[in-house]
C-alpha cells in the first residue's frame, strides 16, 4: 500500500533517534495520519505477507472480552505470549475495556454493545467512541493499550472509523493494526446495515525500531501489489456471532514474509 510506504519514508527521513522502554532504540516522529477507502479493497499489506489468521483471531478475542492467551494459543496465535503471566493472564487489557469497562461506581459497561446500539439508533451522534485507555486500570495491564481510542462516523449510508494510536511500531504492529480495524469496521457495517466507508489511522509516537530499519528498507524496494478483497461467508446479525470461518480473503498476492524481532 502506498500509504504505508509513505509512512515508512516519512519516519526514516524525519524521525529522531530516541531511547525507549524496551532498550532497543527507535527512529521516532510524532503525529501522522493515513486514510484507506474500504471500497477500494481490503487494506492488508502486500510488501510483505501478513498472517491473517493472527489478525482475525486477535480481533475475535478482543470482541469476546477475553484477556487470557489460551484462546489465541489454541488457534495457533502467539503474538501475546511474551506479555502473559504463568497462567496466561494479561490483566484488564483490550477485551476487558471494550466489553466490561469498570466505572467509578463499580458498574461495568459493554462499550461494543453500546456502540452498535448507538450506530443503529442515532447514527449522527458524535459520541460513537470506544476507549481502551482506562486510567484507573493501566497499572494492572501487562501492556497499556497502544491503539487506545476509536470513533465511528456515519454518512451517506457508509460507516467510517478513525483510530488514535498513541504508540505505533511501524514494521510489526502497524500492518496488523490497519487490517484489524479495517476488518472491525467492515464487521460493524455489516451488522448495522451500512456499507464500509473509510478507515482513518492517526498516530501519536510512530516509530521504527533500530533493529527493523533493514527490513523496512527492503519493503521500500518492493512494488505495491493490488489489494485483496474480503467478504463474509454468511449473513451475521450480531457482531459477537462472527467466527474465523466467516472471513474470506480473495486475491491476496503479497511479497514474501519478512522476519523481525519483537521488542518487549
Swiss-Prot record:
Pfam family, one: Thymidylat_synt
Keyword Ribosomal protein: no
Annotated localization: Cytoplasm
Entries under PROSITE patterns matching the protein: THYMIDYLATE_SYNTHASE
GO biological process, one term: methylation
EC number(s) recorded for this UniProt protein: 2.1.1.45
Keywords, in A-Z order: Cytoplasm, Methyltransferase, Nucleotide biosynthesis, Transferase
Keyword Cytoplasm in record: yes
Residues the entry annotates as binding dUMP: 21, 126-127, 166-169, 177, 207-209
Disulphide bridges, residue numbers: none
InterPro entries xrefs: Thymidate_synth/dCMP_Mease, Thymidate_synth/dCMP_Mease_dom, Thymidate_synth/dCMP_Mease_sf, Thymidylate_synthase, Thymidylate_synthase_AS
A GO CC term assigned to this protein in UniProt: cytosol
Pathway(s) annotated for this protein in UniProt: Pyrimidine metabolism; dTTP biosynthesis
SUPFAM superfamilies recorded: Thymidylate synthase/dCMP hydroxymethylase
Residues bound to (6R)-5,10-methylene-5,6,7,8-tetrahydrofolate: 51, 169, 263
Functional note: Catalyzes the reductive methylation of 2'-deoxyuridine-5'-monophosphate (dUMP) to 2'-deoxythymidine-5'-monophosphate (dTMP) while utilizing 5,10-methylenetetrahydrofolate (mTHF) as the methyl donor and reductant in the reaction, yielding dihydrofolate (DHF) as a by-product. This enzymatic reaction provides an intracellular de novo source of dTMP, an essential precursor for DNA biosynthesis.
Assembly, per entry: Homodimer.
Family: Belongs to the thymidylate synthase family. Bacterial-type ThyA subfamily.
Protein name (record): Thymidylate synthase 2
Organism: Bacillus amyloliquefaciens
The organism's taxonomic lineage, starting at the top: Bacteria, Bacillati, Bacillota, Bacilli, Bacillales
Gene name of the encoded protein: thyA2
